[in-house]
Amino acid sequence: MPLTAVQKTLSAQFVHMTATNDKVAQKFLKNANWKLDIAADAYFNSNPNMATSSSSKPKLDKMFSDLQDTQEDSPDELGAGSAIEYASSLGVDPESVGIFVLMELVKAPAFGVITRSGFVEGWQATNAPASKSGQKDYIQSVIRNLPQDHELFKRVYRHAFIAGRETPEQRALPLENALVYWQCFFGPEMPHSKPWVAKSSQSGGTTDFLDLWTEYLKNNWSRTVSKDMWNQTLDFAVKSTADSTLSFWTPEGSWPSVIDGFVEWLRNKGIGVASGMEVDS
């Protein structure tokens, strides 16, 4: 069966990452159900001639030291300035979802903070070449694959709650920060996002749920964003993108109260209502 356009793109990315050929790329991608990061890990793990985790550790440790600003950074951390400079050197826009892909890979404990252990262990796990160019190729491939790989997207999204904190001790995100992060993940105009936009069953047009969610929170939510609220927003976004009538939602469900309030607010506006359903006046 011929490859789809998406599969051809994934195959080309695999070849670029591993310096192998199309036949090998397609074999590993098929075995990994066309999940690029899983296929690449399987390839590197099956090839003893590739750089091993143990042999890459000294190189990664030196790379981390070279990235540090000796006057600003502590011995085992990159501060915000160094972290953003590093991200930019990999072609990662610090104002896009790509920054959260990188922060998840290195297990950043707060925004703009990269620890030595997170950097070394995170990159070791990828088996990507321990070089700036190797890391750039790898991270760009993962970023490009983000919208198509739901498990990867979910993993990066969930870690964004941790990486988006102002300090590791912070237990919740300020609303204004969370709104910016949601825009990175769900904004229709943002690169490599998963737009939180659904086809309307009534008008035949589209419903921009992210825009409505932002409006609702700005006018009705004065608290911070908890981890549970953050995680369940993704679940709600996925379901509402697939079903603009919100038929999956019930008052007896386990959604947080802020989402219950959002659904009620939407239905009072005539949004998220199945055809023929009455709306309380």
From Swiss-Prot:
SUPFAM superfamilies the record matches: UBA-like
Entry GO MF terms: cullin family protein binding; ubiquitin conjugating enzyme binding; ubiquitin-like protein binding
Membrane listed as a keyword: no
Keywords, sorted A to Z: Ubl conjugation pathway
GO BP: protein neddylation
Domain spans labelled UBA-like: 7-44
Residue ranges occupied by any DCUN1 domain in the UniProt entry: 55-267
Database matches in Pfam families: Cullin_binding, UBA_4
Cellular-component GO terms for this entry: ubiquitin ligase complex
The keyword Amino-acid biosynthesis appears for this protein: no
Stored PROSITE patterns: DCUN1
Role noted for this protein: May contribute to neddylation of cullin components of SCF-type E3 ubiquitin ligase complexes. Neddylation of cullins play an essential role in the regulation of SCF-type complexes activity.
Entry protein name: Defective in cullin neddylation protein 1
Source species: Pyricularia oryzae (strain 70-15 / ATCC MYA-4617 / FGSC 8958) (Rice blast fungus)
